[in-house]
Amino acid sequence: MIKLFVGLGNPGPEYEFTRHNAGFWWLDAVARELKASLAMDKTYHGLVTRVTVNGQAVWLLKPQTFMNLSGKSVAALARFFKIEPQEILVAHDELDIVPGEAKLKLGGSHAGHNGLRDIHAQLGTDDYWRLRLGVGHPGVKSEVINWVLKKPSLDHRLAMDQCIARAITALPHLLAGDMDKATLLIHTSKPPRPKPPRPENTLPAVP
């Protein structure tokens, strides 16, 4: 089962609504679902809360170290409470997935994501779960930093919010350790296609 849920982002109001904070948005949704409130804990360099699910302690964490030092926070909590890498799920923004979609993944490269890069380094492994929340790609590599540090368009933000809400439905499976069911649910829960416009009532053409 997942014992540590981590949402990645940058602290501070100037970053709150930027694409890079998608992981924070998801973790906030998890906290609401579990009726939990996070509080700053300097020992773990982040906003933290502990809940009990079916007799098991579960931790929620939002590192407050800035993105490129996220691993410092994750490793501090995981090591103290003896949480194994495969019991950790990290939610983060993903350039290679369109807004409105998410993917669950175990292990693999950090793909240039500085938060994941530092978690890899601090844990000494890439063998942890990631929830990849699509934010889309600007189309030009040189614009990536500006892209993730800006607010998404209203349409993209709505799609991302809906995606986060759908991903929350997999939470019981994540907590139970049924990663296959969680993966299936997250990967198949795509936004519904918009309905085609209703045809207008028109009079028949006059011959």
From Swiss-Prot:
<feature type="binding site">
    <location>
        <position position="66"/>
    </location>
    <ligand>
        <name>tRNA</name>
    </ligand>
</feature>
<dbReference type="InterPro" id="IPR001328">
    <property type="entry name" value="Pept_tRNA_hydro"/>
</dbReference>
<dbReference type="Pfam" id="PF01195">
    <property type="entry name" value="Pept_tRNA_hydro"/>
</dbReference>
<feature type="region of interest" description="Disordered">
    <location>
        <begin position="188"/>
        <end position="207"/>
    </location>
</feature>
<comment type="function">
    <text>Catalyzes the release of premature peptidyl moieties from peptidyl-tRNA molecules trapped in stalled 50S ribosomal subunits, and thus maintains levels of free tRNAs and 50S ribosomes.</text>
</comment>
<keyword id="KW-0694">RNA-binding</keyword>
<keyword id="KW-0378">Hydrolase</keyword>
<dbReference type="InterPro" id="IPR018171">
    <property type="entry name" value="Pept_tRNA_hydro_CS"/>
</dbReference>
<dbReference type="GO" id="GO:0000049">
    <property type="term" value="F:tRNA binding"/>
</dbReference>
<comment type="similarity">
    <text>Belongs to the PTH family.</text>
</comment>
<keyword id="KW-0963">Cytoplasm</keyword>
<feature type="binding site">
    <location>
        <position position="114"/>
    </location>
    <ligand>
        <name>tRNA</name>
    </ligand>
</feature>
<feature type="active site" description="Proton acceptor">
    <location>
        <position position="20"/>
    </location>
</feature>
<dbReference type="GO" id="GO:0005737">
    <property type="term" value="C:cytoplasm"/>
</dbReference>
<feature type="binding site">
    <location>
        <position position="15"/>
    </location>
    <ligand>
        <name>tRNA</name>
    </ligand>
</feature>
<dbReference type="GO" id="GO:0072344">
    <property type="term" value="P:rescue of stalled ribosome"/>
</dbReference>
<dbReference type="GO" id="GO:0004045">
    <property type="term" value="F:peptidyl-tRNA hydrolase activity"/>
</dbReference>
<feature type="site" description="Stabilizes the basic form of H active site to accept a proton">
    <location>
        <position position="93"/>
    </location>
</feature>
<protein>
    <recommendedName>
        <fullName>Peptidyl-tRNA hydrolase</fullName>
        <ecNumber>3.1.1.29</ecNumber>
    </recommendedName>
</protein>
<comment type="function">
    <text>Hydrolyzes ribosome-free peptidyl-tRNAs (with 1 or more amino acids incorporated), which drop off the ribosome during protein synthesis, or as a result of ribosome stalling.</text>
</comment>
<feature type="binding site">
    <location>
        <position position="68"/>
    </location>
    <ligand>
        <name>tRNA</name>
    </ligand>
</feature>
<feature type="site" description="Discriminates between blocked and unblocked aminoacyl-tRNA">
    <location>
        <position position="10"/>
    </location>
</feature>
<dbReference type="InterPro" id="IPR036416">
    <property type="entry name" value="Pept_tRNA_hydro_sf"/>
</dbReference>
<comment type="subunit">
    <text>Monomer.</text>
</comment>
<dbReference type="GO" id="GO:0006515">
    <property type="term" value="P:protein quality control for misfolded or incompletely synthesized proteins"/>
</dbReference>
<keyword id="KW-0820">tRNA-binding</keyword>
